Design a protein with these regions (language model features):
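Conserved beta-strand elements of the Class I
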Residues: 15-17
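Structural motif
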Residues: 70-71, 95
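Glycine-rich, highly charged phosphate/nucleotide-binding loops
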Residues: 51-67, 73-83
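A charged, well-structured terminal subsegment
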Residues: 125-144
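Short acidic, glycine/proline-enriched helix-loop-strand junctions
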Residues: 66-67, 105-128
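ADP-ribose/adenylate-binding Rossmann-like module
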Residues: 88-111
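NAD(P)-binding Rossmann-fold cofactor-contacting core
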Residues: 22-25, 31-52
Length: 144
């Protein structure tokens, strides 16, 4: 089993950092999708603290969440990742997941030192679809 498939099978609680209250943003679409497939997703956005996104209370930072977090899923620029990685270690999360286009070598090293799984430049929604949903290819009907 691949590491990603194992992560998505084993861990079901996600702190999603950088979720927007705009329903057209990728972060909100991914959050809704993961909720629909059985994941408990906590939105983290300091600008929306105390509000609700997709019926979930929004937290300012991951350390404000009282429940145990398995995956910290990041929708923030790479330059902000290391601070989030430090918080990931502090809360005892099992995985730091960086969305498409996001990378941080120092964060990767920190995760390795603390035995925390690290995924970069991958979308949780797309990876879930790849491993767990066998979508039939739709072909257009051709006519004369």
């Amino acid at each position: 089993m691949s590491d990603i498939k194992e992560i998505l099978s084993k861990y079901k609680t996600i702190a999603m950092v950088g979720v927007s209250n705009d329903p057209t943003k990728a972060s909100t679409i991914v959050m809704k999708y993961m909720q629909e497939y059985g994941y408990k997703v906590y939105p983290v956005n300091p600008r929306a603290e105390g509000k609700k996104i997709l019926v979930q209370e929004v937290f300012a930072k991951i350390s404000d969440i009282k429940d145990q977090i398995d995956i910290v899923d990041v929708f923030r620029p790479s330059k902000e990742v290391y601070a989030i990685a430090e918080d990931t270690v502090k809360i005892g999360a099992k995985v730091l997941w960086l969305q498409l286009g996001i990378r941080d070598e120092k964060a990767k090293d920190l995760m390795e030192k603390n035995d925390i799984k690290y995924v970069e430049n991958k979308c949780t929604k797309m990876e879930y679809q790849k491993y767990f949903l066998k979508v039939r290819q739709a072909f257009p009907v051709l006519s004369d």
